[in-house]
Every structure is written in structure tokens, then in C-alpha cells.
Amino acid sequence: MSVPSAIATPIAVAATPRASRARGGVVQGRISKSGNPLRVAPRANRRPVASPMAARAVATGPDGYSVDGMGCAELDEQLWEHEGHLKYRWEKFQERKAAIADAEGSLAEFAKGYTKFGFNKTASGEIVFREWAPAACRAALIGDFNGWNPDATHLEKDEYGVWSVTLPAGAIEHGSRVKIRMKKGDGGWVDRVPAWIKMSYSEPGVMGANYDGIYWDPPEHERYARKNPRPQKPPASRIYEAHVGMSGLEAKVNSYREFADDILPRIKDLGYNTVQLMAVMEHAYYGSFGYHVTSPFAVSSRCGNPEDLKYLVDAAHGMGIRVLLDVIHSHVSCNVEDGIAGFDFGQPTQDSYFGEGEAGYHWLWDSRLYNYENWEVQRYLLSNLRYWVDEYGFDGFRFDGITSMLYNHHGLQMEFSGDYNQYFGFDTNVPAVNYLMMANDMLHESYPGIEVIAEDVSGMPTLCRPVREGGIGFDARLAMAIPDIWVRLLQASREGNLRDEDWSMHDIVATLCNRRYTEKCIGYSESHDQSIVGSKTNAFWLMDAEMYEGMSTFEEASPVVDRGMALHKMLRLITMAIGGEGYLNFMGNEFGHPEWVDFPREGNQWSHDHCRRRWDLADTEYLRYYELNNFDRAMMNLDKRYEFLAHEHQWVSTACDERKLIIAERGPLIFVFNFHPTNTYEDLEIGVGMPGKYRITLDTDAWDFGGKGRVIHDAEHFTNPGGPESWVGPYEQEPRPCGMKVLSPARSAQVYFKVPEVEDPMKAAAAAAGVSEFREIRVSNAGADGAHSFDRAAAPTPPPAPAGGRPRGSFYDPDNVDPDFAPRGGMNSSQFRAAPVPPIAPSNYAAPQRREIVDDSNIDPDFRPRAPANFGASSGGSPPPPPPASNVVSPVRRKKVVDPDNIDPDFR
């Protein structure tokens, strides 16, 4: 979640020193009184803020670290008002880091505790077990290996409260059960799962069965060996949030290997470059979504064993996909019989993993909270991070719920207004902040390409500034206010309290762009939080029960489905366009998954029916879920092609409440959003930052995505000097350098790219061959990667072709040409400069055309072609003339079988 700051936001729209209010712990932004945007100067032209406080010199040491922790104040003058607090937390961070280096060698070595604690083997094969339990009076290792005899394997305690024992090689069999038995100060004995255990297990199907630790030491031939290198860190992360257990189509718990084999290819096909895995750390209660962790070092045994998880991560790397772990260091399950919570005997804080009183308990989550100031707890948590990276190959982390860590009040019953006094004072949990600084410092120093993301609802300043500047060190934060505004708008519309005509473009832009300069955000329109039972996904808010009855393309969409399809695409696209420097989606939401997530529980008779993903809906071509899935693929590959998420040029030029228009520039792209339910704008003049020629590269209204096909995709739009003169929106501080005219249909969005102004080798070759007229033929690769990346071809001057352009709203493949095709007449507005379509010359093809064999025995008698309702009516144009008879879609659908061995080399 992000909060306003006094400095310019990355996107050039309203940024204010304060937010107006907070709803449910989430800051709601407002716009400055002037309504004018704050713009970001080019990096080379930036100057210090004109303030005596902001102009203070920031000193750095020879190691590049800030001398006093005030480097983060260089870009935020409000931080100087809290200089004392920031210097204090920096001093404490440096003190502990120096003490660790003195005692352990370095922070990185300190974080290798998993090689010393728990079960480890010496070079000679002996088994060494160590456990930190200073409150225990006596301890013994028990398990299958010694018949659970508490007198067989006693542990010895050192001066630091560490118990240990060394066993002969082979004394414990791989896969056998183990526990530690400890005597408490009151004389009682307890059996506990070792805190550093690598795997734990509970008998499936047995109600109330407790977990046992599992000694995991497979023989060499059973160990998984990595085959693929880590993918490089992408310019911007397109994150697919996934839960392995509920990722299958069948009503069961899916496995790590099934996810790797069946789901990862889907993620790759959609164009995501990162997968964020939930519920990997062992948790006793499946319905907790993985957030009530019992054993932080153990993999969730429901989905497989450690070698299976290594297979998954390596398979992702082989596909070029990075893997983030949803790590939970903000709290831990209270289940004393199942995990680390059992090591609390009521001892003093200095001898415990957990704090005392309110410092050690989160009443809303019913969870224990770590004692972040304790030396051994810091070792435990830092080593936990390094273990997942070193042992399994994870590429980063998403830190869950760190608001609970940042403040002594844990964010409970708090409304964060953006006032800096809420962030820097006695409410701040400085030891927890220092732990997060050490975690990020260790991770980024040890693994330069790692990515660490924070989930924080408070908007803590400096959260995503480097540790060397005095920041907390995260790479990005989740923009948690964005899904809230969509839920608020969609719920109000569904309940009849807000018309679409009354949506505020001003509020939408303010929320999506409300983030602190230089602190990156991951934008998302919805996540697992909106998918869980009791909440609703955007698709469910939009279409409700009609998602079950009105999604067949054999029938005309109802008004509810038509609206839902259009807005589902628009909400996701605008979130990605201006909502952050990265993007996240929860699995299934990309195609509007119609069912909520309800884990097996007593209330649903322990059913898995709603704890799975209906991939079959996205794969069925005659369902509208298939079209939404296609759009998500195209949206991901839009960034893959243009890298606009990582681009520094970000500018929202227009947010017009009267016309319901939002226009933004991001990198080389122009985004035009028309949220009006009925008004289509022809010859709409929009401001553009760079002069030149533009074309559409993505259209929510395209036929391929379940749209109405109201826009001609191959039209060329040329800019004119001077900004738009027809009107200036309330967000436009001044007209843009130039303008161009576009068609903006109701409830749709189009993305334009600037055609590079370089000498075209294809045109040069055509001119050399005596071709007087040149036309680009766009070969859509949408079926392969969804990005609409195009090859190009030139043709000699053809004989006169029928008037008009190619069909609007469709991308087609010139390798599959109907020689009898005559294009329909289209809307020829003055802004469209399209040459007639020439026939394709055979010399333009790299491969010969294949003949198509039609199987007349495979006919769908119920197939009826769809036709756009009231084509052209919304834009004021007349309906196009009917196409020639040879162009009319057959009233039956035939299966086309391509014979690759049947090639016609003379095809024309």
C-alpha cells in the first residue's frame, strides 16, 4: 500500500503531503487543491528540493553506506523532521551488524545457521543435532531410531542455551520420525517438533493428528540436482500468485510436480516472468492459506517432499520464470504440538523465540509474534531466508503482513493518515525494523539479483529505499489501495448505489498513482484476498450469477455480461498501465474464475470442490473465459515487447469525469481509456508527448478478446503540432507538445505504439524493386504469445483492390489467406490513413502455403456465427455493407485438418 509524499510521484499526477482519510487501515489519497499534476523531471535534470532542510548534505562512508542513516532524506524533506528517530534506528542497526560480524564473521555467515542447527552431517557421516532451548532443564532426542526412548539419546547444553548431540553415521534412517523431549522449569515434560526441522508430517485423514518431525537425508540418487541456471532479474516483474495445493482441476490437493508439469506451462504461455508461491512453509491448518506457519524451514508435506519442490523451482527456471516465496516472518501458528510455538514455556523474553504479552501475541490473527531483538531469533529468521534461496533456489520473497512487525500496536485498530508522526515514534518497533534492514542487507549483498517485496498497509516511508541510505531495503511494496477502490466501485454499482456514469476518473487516477517517488510498487486489481470465500473477485462483482449461464459465445452476451467483460479487461489494463512498476495476478483471476476459494472445512463437509481451479473454462474456445484468458496473455506480452512497466517516462495527461476518459503515457505507449457506458468519441483529439506515427498494439474491444470490433487496428495516426485544442481535461496542467485523433468506443481501451522513425529496409527494398506503393502486412503472433508482435512484408503494386480497409477489430495471419476475400467497408474517418490492401506476393513467404483438408464428417449442427449487434451504431457510422458471398461465414463449423506433408509449392 502506498501513501502520498511531498515529492513528485513517478507518474505525473497529483501527489500531496497528506492523505485525506483511511478506510480499514488503507490510505485513501486525495488531490492537491490546485488539481495540477506534479511531474517528474528527467534524472539528469533533477535538483535538490528548494528547502534548507532538504538541501542538507548527506555523507556516505567508503563502503557506500550512509554515515548516519539520513541518505534516504535526500529526496524526502519530511524525513528531516524525524532525524533523531532515523539516526537512532540506524545506530542500532549498525551496532547489531558489527556485533554479529565480530562474533560470527559476517552477517552472511550468521545467516547460515541451518548448517549448524537442526540435523547436519559431518564429513565422516556423523549426525549432529543442535537446538536452542535455554528454558529447558533437560532434553533428549526421541524418534523411530531409538524406539522413542527418552533415556536413549540425551542432549548436552552449552552456556548459550544450545542443546546438542552427535550420533554415529546411519544412526537415524532417512524419512523416520523424530522429536525433541524437554523438561520445563515446572518439572513437566513436553515433546516438540524440532524448530529447524526440514520436513514435518501429519497422518492424512486423521482428525486432530499432530505433526512429527521427519529426518530428511535421502540417498544421493534420490536427491534432486538442479539442471537450469537462475533467470536474470527482469526489468519489471509480472507476478503470477499461485497456491500449489489448489492449483489442479481435480478436487484434491495438487502436488509440486503436478504444478510444475501442468501449471507452469500455462504461466509461461500467458507471459508472466515470475511466480509467487503461497503456502510452501509447513502449516497445520490447510484453510489458513498457508499463513499459520508451524515449521518455517519445512516444506508443506501435503504437496510433496523437499525434492519435489526443488523440481518445481528448477522447472520454472528452465522456462525462464523466477520463483518468489511467500515468507511469513510476521507471525507464527499458536499450535504448540505442531511446531515452533511449542518452544515457549512461559520463560523470560530473552530466552524465548517470542515476545511477552501484547508484544508476543496478535489477537486478530490468533498468532504468536517473534522476539525480533533476540540474537538467536535473528539467526533463526535470517538463516530461514538464506536456506530457501540456497537449498531450493528461490529468487526472492514476498514478506507477508509486515505492518504487524513495524509497529508495537501491530497496525490493529489504526487508521494511517500519512502523517509521518505515525511512522517514526514510540509506536515504531525498532528491533523489528532493524531485523528487516538486516534481512534485506544480507539478501542483496549475498544475491545481487534477488527481489524482495513487502506487504504493508501503513505506507511506512523509506520501506523501499536501500539499506545503505538508511532505508528498510525492500525492492517494492504491494499497492494495496488499488484493489480496494475497485471493490468499492463494483460493490456500489452492484448494489445500485452508484451508476457507471458517476465513477470518478479523478479518484481512480489518484489511487492508482498514489505512491512515493523512487519507492516501487507492485500494482494489482485483485489477489487471493479477493478470491477467498466471504469476498468476491472483480468478475463476480461484475457478472455474479450470469457467470454460470451467460458465458457461451453461441449466444449474444446479456447487458450484464457485456458490461462485465468490458470492465474486467479495462480494470486490469489500467491497473497495469499506471498502478505500479510491476504487476501481480492471482491464479485464475486472469480469465474471471467463476468460483470463490473455500478450503476444506467442517462447514463445507471437508469438500475440495471450491479449492481448485477450473482451467477447463479457460481452455474452451466457445466460452468467454477463453477470450478473457487471451486478453491477459496479450496484456502480459505487451510489457514483454515494450517494457513499459520499467520505463521512466510515465505521464497521466487526462482524467475527465465528464467524458469518463483517462489518457496516459507509459514508456513508448499511449493508453486511452473510455469508461463511459454509452458514449463513443470519434475524432477524439488526445495529447501526445512525442510527434510521429502511431498504431494500435492492443485493444480491449478486439474480437479476439470478446469485444465488438469497433476500431480499425491497422489505421495510422499522425500527430499534429500543438496540444489538443478541443478541450483540456482537469488533470492537464498544459497541453501536450502535440496531438492526434483517435476513435474511442464506449467501455473500451486502446494502446498505441509509436512507429520507429528509422529507414525501413523493407521499404527501401521495395523501392529498389520498382514498387510504387508499400503496405505493411501485420502477422499476428497472438496465438503464440498474445503480444501481437508482428512480422512485416512488402508487395508490388497490385491491381485495384476493393475499397475499404481490412476488418476492424481483428488480427489475422497473412499466411492463411482466402483468395476470394474482399474486405468489408469500414469507417473512414479523416484521421485514418490506410492504403488499399494489395494481394500477397508469393515471394513474401518464408515457407510455402499448406493446403487445408476439411473434414465434412465433423460438423457442429448447432454452430451459429456471431455477428456484432448494432455494428457502427454507437459510433454514429452506418452499418458496413454485407461482404461477398464467398466471405460469409458458413452456418456450420468444420474441423480443419492441416496436412504438413501436403505442400503446394506453387501456391499463389
What are these regions (language model features)?
Residues E131, I180, A242, L277, ...:
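Generic structural signal for small/hydrophobic residues in well-ordered secondary structure
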Residues S301-N305, D344-E356, I472-Q491, R612:
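Acidic, His- and aromatic-enriched active-site or binding-groove loops in soluble protein domains
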Residues G393-D395, H410, E415-H608, K640-W651, ...:
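Conserved alpha/beta catalytic core and glycan-binding cleft of carbohydrate-active enzymes
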Residues M1-A41:
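N-terminal chloroplast transit peptides
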Residues I263, D308, L312, V377-W388, ...:
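Alpha-helical packing segments of well-folded alpha/beta enzyme cores
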Residues S200, H221-I239, H243-T428:
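Substrate-binding/active-site clefts of carbohydrate-active enzymes
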Residues A50, A54-Y240, Y256-G271, V560-N585, ...:
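Carbohydrate-interacting/catalytic domains
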Residues I239-E250, V293-P296, G360-E373, G418-Y420, ...:
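Short glycine/proline-rich turn/loop motifs
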